[in-house]
A protein has these predicted regions:
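Beta-rich carbohydrate-recognition and catalytic domains
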Residues: 1-203, 207-286, 291-361, 374-376, ...
Length: 511
């Protein structure tokens, strides 16, 4: 084994195995995307005058209780439009049974009693740990009601989309910030807009503790024919410093209000987009980016991947190609160490349900937010039988249950496999594995010096196998589990497995 040029300081932090950072050499192994362990429809009461407007939703863990923000529209409307969408709120203690928040601030669709918190708003609420402007709750999204005058003052003088009188281009658009002390009563941030562009999907903003800046993930526009929707990224040092930092392009059409049409790559770099490995007409958007707070250097995104039917002819087998801007969507998984460079793994994370089921089979969008309860992570997504561009059937919200750290694993089959890490420097006296060996699998860990020489007492021959299934299994050798004598010096791990899935490792103090 050649001398290493880099030693990874892992301390006592948990390290996830979703890329090759900790796999310097290997044989007989593969990385695997693991879909949710369980998918359960939620029980969400409905109001007679409203129906789902789109698939966009967000779940927040607020003081141990779950808050679900989702979007509805008046039932009599034929097709969803962001200007007739309403952001609504529900609460739950168990994540399955929900109650509508008794907001009762606006009369909508003839309903005086309802859970609408923001009429004409489409976007993503988030919790700001910095409590900018003294507010814990913030929201990023589009604003603009159809009703005149708007029933909500905060939607006045906003632009979701309009048409320029000179050339007919749709250029009046912006993305806005709002804030709230209680998550129910919202006020618009008046110091500016996030971006003066039309990003009419579920956009995101959150504080990145690693960089000390606020990060926005926005819908971008690709110049590549057939690949229109992308994910763009911008930053700002503060929520009050608007717009987010982007280079101006004076050649872009501009409305009298100083607003533009789509967000192009010269103004905001793409971090996710369709490419040559996708079908020619494929969009990637609504990224649902989640910094993973239970491990080091891990960000998971769950973009919707949309394959367009345009230009197809199914010869009357079905309706493919008969309508513009139509086609199916699935949720894929993208992984990142820094929130900038993403590796989109092409296996569906939440795929389409059976077409024969009345509520499934057309489109799936993941909601924003990860919630941990014990050894499991919970997410929420919306699925419907309708494909994009067809809105004759409603969407339904589901809960997805995932194992802690379980999104990606390094897997060995029954013939076995192994990998060796680069040199790492740890703290603590115990080594823990999040691993599933089932009933027939096992794993062994050998610790080596920086050059790859097995360390006495920690060789493969000394190793006691780890078996069965656990999120924090202690590694032992014949002399016991104590790795404290090696703390603070460069070592390598050689992990040998068969019939096993390894998700993460972590050094810790003795238990």
């Amino acid at each position: 084994m050649a001398d290493a040029t880099q030693v990874w300081p892992v301390g006592t932090g948990k390290q996830l195995l979703f890329d090759r950072r900790f796999v310097e050499s290997s044989a007989g192994l593969q990385f695997t995307v693991n879909p949710p362990l369980q998918r359960t429809p939620v029980n969400l009461p409905s109001l007679s005058g409203l129906r789902p407007s789109n698939h966009y939703l967000t779940v927040l863990d607020v003081d141990g209780r779950l808050w679900l923000y989702y979007h509805m529209r008046p039932r009599e409307t034929s097709e969803p439009d962001h200007r007739n969408s309403m952001c609504c709120l529900a609460w739950s203690d168990d994540g399955i049974d929900w109650e509508l928040a008794p907001v009762d601030r606006f009369e909508v669709a003839g309903l005086a009693r309802n859970n609408v918190v923001m009429p004409g708003a489409v976007g993503t609420p988030f919790l700001d740990a910095q409590q900018t402007c003294g507010c814990r709750f913030w929201f990023v999204g589009t604003l603009g009601e159809r009703t005149e005058p708007p029933v909500w003052d905060e939607a006045r003088d906003t632009y979701f989309g309009g048409y320029d009188a000179d050339d007919g281009r749709r250029v009046h658009a912006a993305v806005y910030l709002l804030h709230s002390e209680d998550g129910i009563s919202w006020r618009r941030q008046r110091s500016g807009v996030v971006v003066p562009f039309r990003c009419d999907s579920q956009n995101q903003v959150f504080y990145d503790a690693g960089t000390g800046a606020y990060v926005a993930y926005l819908r971008g526009a690709s110049p590549v024919p057939g690949r229109r929707r992308t994910v763009a990224r911008l930053t700002s040092p503060a929520l009050t410093q608007l717009p987010f930092d982007f280079p101006e392009d004076t050649t872009l059409p501009r409305s009298p209000a100083g607003l533009h049409d789509r967000l192009p790559p010269q103004c905001a770099p793409f971090v996710m987009a369709g490419d040559e490995r996708d079908p020619s007409a494929t969009d990637v958007y609504t990224p649902c980016v989640n910094p993973y707070e239970w491990a080091d250097d891990a960000t998971f995104a769950f973009p919707a991947v949309y394959r367009h039917y345009e230009g197809q002819d199914s010869h009357e087998r079905d309706d493919r190609g008969q309508k513009q801007n139509a086609g199916p969507l699935e949720v894929q998984l993208a992984v990142s160490r820094d929130g900038v460079t993403f590796d989109r793994l092409r296996t569906p994370y939440v795929g389409l349900g059976l077409m024969e089921e009345p509520q499934l089979g057309g489109s799936v969008y993941m909601g924003v937010g990860l919630v941990r309860r014990g050894n499991y992570i919970y997410q929420y997504y919306a699925e419907g039988a309708c494909t994009h561009g067809h809105y004759d059937r409603d969407v339904h919200i589901w809960q997805a249950k995932q194992r802690l750290d379980g999104f990606v694993s390094v897997d060995a089959g029954p013939d076995g496999g192994w990998f060796v890490t680069p040199p790492i420097e740890f703290a603590g006296s115990r080594l823990l594995l999040n691993i599933d060996c089932g009933a027939t699998g096992e794993a062994w860990v050998e610790l080596q010096d920086e050059t790859g020489k097995p360390l006495p007492g920690y060789t493969f021959e000394d190793a006691v196998s780890v078996d069965r299934n656990g999120v924090a299994q202690e590694v032992w050798w014949r002399g016991g589990p104590d790795v404290g004598p090696l703390s603070g010096r460069p070592v390598r791990m050689r992990v040998t497995m068969r019939s096993a899935k390894l998700y993460a490792f972590q050094f810790s103090e003795s238990r």
